[in-house]
């Protein structure tokens, strides 16, 4: 296994999200994040019956099936606005939108680690 670090690039879109990895000069590769597909809907569903948090297509399916809960989409539009630090009630929990978005990014990180078989480190653009 190479000791050279892989680089991950996250495209957090309003509707869909993708994640690509590359090492050195190799071509970047979009990872299959859900059901073998390289895109995952930027959607979160909080299931009130089971207290599970679902992401992507699974989140949409639970919402469409009528499961009691709360669906959130288009969270990217909150970033950079005064709403980012605002808090929202999800059943008995109070969460900021940044915490909710952080949960989505954390889920993507976990899926990427499973897919590439390596730990993914998160940092800002400056390292």
Predicted regions and their residues:
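Gly/Thr-rich phosphate-binding beta-strand-loop-beta motif of the actin/hexokinase/Hsp70
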Residues: 2-30
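Phosphate-binding loop and its immediate beta->loop->alpha context
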Residues: 25-127
